[in-house]
Amino acid sequence: MIGTCYLHTVIDDYSRVAYVEAHDDETKETATQVLRNAVAWFAERGVTVQRVLSDNGSCYKSHLWHQTCTDLGITPKKTRPYRPQTNGKIERFHRTLADGWAYARCYTSEAERRGELDGWLHYYNHHRPHTACGNQPPFSRLINVPGQYI
């Protein structure tokens, strides 16, 4: 039986490089830890997070979320309620993710499906052509990755 999975997604607005974690919940504690992990992951790739645009879920309205953003030097912004178009990049990515990973084949378990996520994300970020990137993969737009020119 396939279980419930909450995908916490962070996408760089310029490059479209995606960071995703699959969790069993969408609590404020989980959301803030994902944000911390994503900020560190992007920093390792030469990207400094300055702003974060989130929907209006309760975890993103919490004091903990705002305090975490302050601690990380990030300005939190919210989408307009009931207007998913405000966060169109994430919405479109989730459709691509659903088609290319979540429902691309029959998985025998949620654990098996989650186990395939990192491989699919690598493909998406490093190999899959993206129209917003001139039919290059998102990672091709990151030009200051530490160690890239050594």
Task: Locate predicted features.
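A structural motif
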Residues: 8-10, 89-96
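RNase H-like polynucleotidyl transferase catalytic core
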Residues: 51-56, 70-89, 105-108
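C-terminal domain-tail junction helix/linker
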Residues: 70-74, 95-150
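Mobile-element integrase/transposase regions
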Residues: 1-11, 17, 33, 150
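Distinct, well-ordered alpha-helical segments
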Residues: 65-66
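Hydrophobic (often cysteine-bearing) scaffold residues that line and stabilize catalytic clefts
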Residues: 7, 31, 53, 61, ...
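Active-site beta-loop-alpha junctions of metal-dependent nucleic acid enzymes
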Residues: 3-6, 21-45
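Acidic/histidine-rich, metal-coordinating catalytic segments
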Residues: 26, 44-62, 80-82, 134-139
